[in-house]
Structures are given as structure tokens and as C-alpha cells.
């Protein structure tokens, strides 16, 4: 679920700062100074699919320039609009590789891993494919977009204008750590995207044949310092949709959710990873076919298991961190209390 103003609620259970910063590396718009939530406009539509965001509840109208691919209007609840999609990855899906971001314990570090490339590699690992699902807008050989770029330097800033034409159904998205402003068809969309609260932002979703113009402005000193950090990429919507459908077909068994357990029976033709739409937490324990196995941090943020070739009967059990220590301390406290009570009784009897 994604609100207009304050987060993807699903991930508020994840308080691990490293995990949240890793989610930033995947393109999620994380408030990195406090690292407690994921803000709205939090990535491209594949980000939402990774997190299992089936519904968006917002005051905005997600149409025209604001349309998010595959999210369809379902009605209103009070002042809120409700949108639904069928294009979320299953709760557990198989990939053949694990993409790991930098794990740096600093909320202000400069991102060097490209989140679009990480997403592209995840999609490749879902279908075991070498083809690209997300590509740089600079790709002159692109079969999904035509683009023309013009740069004008004024007294205070650079103006970078893109005129594009969609050759297929596409979504165009932006990532940058540096302050900038975005204009969609002349109109300003937002300003001052800054390093403590940033991530992938969708520019526009286009159908085949549509033309569009957008402009980015950035102060001269910022642009001259690191203009390569403005990343604009194009999502091949239908191709990504097919990868998601492939993941659903592979997971033929439903996931069974208990109070503190997750169970699934899944077959794998090769050694691979099973990724769950659960934030990684060291409190999880796992077994495969009754034998203990290690949990894996998938793509820096999600819970995963390394599968064996053949049938895998998986059970996940959650034990809160420090639960054993707390239980031990409670037991010791009870024992000490009982000893004190016994000593007090003995004193009373002696008197």
C-alpha cells in the first residue's frame, strides 16, 4: 500500500538502517538521515512490484503525466483515490543471482551503484536472460525510445531538455543525488531533490507513438561537479510485465502464512535463490526439508533462501531479536526472586 504523503506502510516494520539504505540503493526514496520510512514517489513501478505494492491510495489523480503503469482506478474512499495493479511479483519468487549494494554505515554517502542497473539485473535473474529490461536514455541503438537532448547554459544553471518518442510502451524515470528541478511539458513538477531524501522518481509513462518533452535544470556548480549522477532510464513495460508473469508461473504453490511462520513447497531445476517480499531481519530461522539452512539477504533488503536442486519444503520461523536474552534474563530474575522469598521465609521461621 502506498500513500500520497507518507510511505509504503509495508516497510515500516523494518527499522534496520543498513537495510533501509540498501533499499535506497534499489531506488526506493528513503529518508536517509533518520532512515525510518520510505516516502511517497518512491521509485518506478518495478520498485512497487518488488515490494508487493498492489494498491495505491492517494489524493492525487494518477492519470495523464501522473499515470503509473498498470495501476487502474478502482474508486474513491472519502477524499482518497484507490488504484490497483496485477503486476506485483509473487510473495516468493525464484532468481538465479543475488544483487548486493554497498553496505556503508553513513546516511550521507554518495551512491555509486546504479539502482536502475540493479533492477535490470534482478529482472535478468528472474528469467535467466541476458536481455535488458531497463536501459539508459543515452542508448542510441534503442528499439523502445527515440530521444533528442539539448543543453543550454544560462547565468545560473544548465537547462537539459529531452524530446522523446515512445517506440513501445515505456516508463521514463530519473535518479539523482544532486539538487535539481524537473519540468514536464513546460510545467514544474518538483524541485530541490536532495541527498537525504531521494531516490528514483517517475517522469512519465508513455504508450507506443506518444511524444513528450521534459526538462531538468541544475545549478552550474552542481552540474559541473558531477553531472554523471543524473541518471535517466527507460523501462520496457511489456517486457518487465512478462518477467513478472514468468515469476508467477514458476511459483505454482501458494505461500502459507501463520502467526510467526511462513511455509512454501517449491521445486527448483537448479540451485537458485527464493526471494520473499519480507524485509531482511536476523530474527528469521529457516529449514529446507526439515534441515536447518541459512537465511540470505537478497538484493540488500529482502529475506531469501538458497534453494537446493529438486523439491524444497521450506519453513520460516520468526524469533524477535534479543528474545532469547530477554527470556534468559526473565528466568534468572524469577529464580532470584524465588531464592529471596525462600530466604525471607527461613528468616521468619527462625524468628
Where are these regions (language model features)?
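Periplasmic/luminal catalytic loop of GT-C fold multi-pass membrane glycosyltransferases
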Residues: 28-76
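Active-site-proximal, structured, solvent-exposed surfaces of multi-pass membrane proteins
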Residues: 126-351
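Extracytoplasmic/lumenal acceptor-recognition loop(s) of multi-pass membrane glycoenzymes
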Residues: 1-49, 89, 94-127, 190-194, ...
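Residues that flank catalytic or metal-binding motifs in active/ligand-binding sites
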Residues: 52, 79, 282
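C-terminal, active-site-flanking charged/polar segments
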Residues: 7, 67-105, 310
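Short, solvent-exposed loop/turn segments at secondary-structure junctions
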Residues: 62-63, 88-90, 281, 321
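Short conserved micro-motifs at the rims of enzyme active sites and ligand-binding pockets
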Residues: 1, 68, 93-96, 276-277, ...
